[in-house]
Amino acid sequence: MNNNRVIFKVFPEHRIIKAEISDCVFDAIYEFNRKFLAHSTSSLSLSTFYCQDEKFIMPNTFSVVVRCHPDDKFDEEKGKRLALNRLADKYTKSLNKHLENILNAIDESLYELANHL
């Protein structure tokens, strides 16, 4: 997850911090191409045009809300760190799930291809 894409919204009067990242739809496909095909000598890559299956595309936006307990002192920086960590966990779980879906689809396709040879 690129932290530069994270937007924080701070509501001190409600003791709430919201962290959000957008434009994540094709992140799993981009990550697959970067991790698994970057060192390939061919021009092979997954195209976002051909990977419109819901199993491969991530939600567009991820967000988390962190609330400060009434007995605690509201600390904006601490809240932002906590929100960022929770957002990163949520995003990473989804990314890993979608990468696994891509790898499973490739595995199934290779199995079918091998059976046709």
Residue ranges and their predicted role:
Residues M1-L117:
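Catalytic phosphate/metal-binding cores of nucleic-acid and nucleotide-processing enzymes, i.e., regions
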